[in-house]
Amino acid sequence: MKQSIFILFITFSFSTFYAQKEATKTAYFASGCFWCTEAIFELIVGVKSAESGYTGGKTVKPTYEQVCSGNTGHAEAIKVVYYPSSVSYEKLVRAFFESHDPSTLNQQGPDKGTQYRSAIFYQNDTEKQQALSYIKVLKEKKTFKAITTEVVAFTVFYPAEYYHQDYEKKNPNNGYIQGVSKPRMAAFKKKTKLPLYE
């Protein structure tokens, strides 16, 4: 009897483990330099990972230099893998707006260019409506003087070069990280009510 119970427990545990392992969704956002955006989203409880990359353009597998030229149409963006049981898409949208200034067209802080635009790349009608609904609320509350955020259909995401991944963690003393990324992260921490990892 005990052996049967033990086998059932092990079976259930493995089933639960694999169910949890597979129960993730993805979301795509652009809000300026992806070094900053990636680091901020990785703070949020329920986010499994964030990856820097490029989306919203026409060139296949663009390089960083090509994207920076402004000719490919891509935005510096992140791919967020998250557990919907822990954090909803709506909350990620909230974090997106809490972590940058959507009122500046094609600019975040010192970074200027279409690759630094504010954008939400939706994958289905539900995501689209949730993003638009939240923007409507922000406009009604006059949270920002303007909202330039694009809400556009997701097409394809190209991961950025290896050295861009987890850039803030790998280069904490970098001048840009100290002068731009860290202050932006601190402002987000102060503003958000979402649970964050230590």
Give the location of each predicted region.
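Flexible coil/turn and secondary-structure edge motifs
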Residues: 20-198
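Bacterial Sec-dependent N-terminal signal peptides
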Residues: 1-22
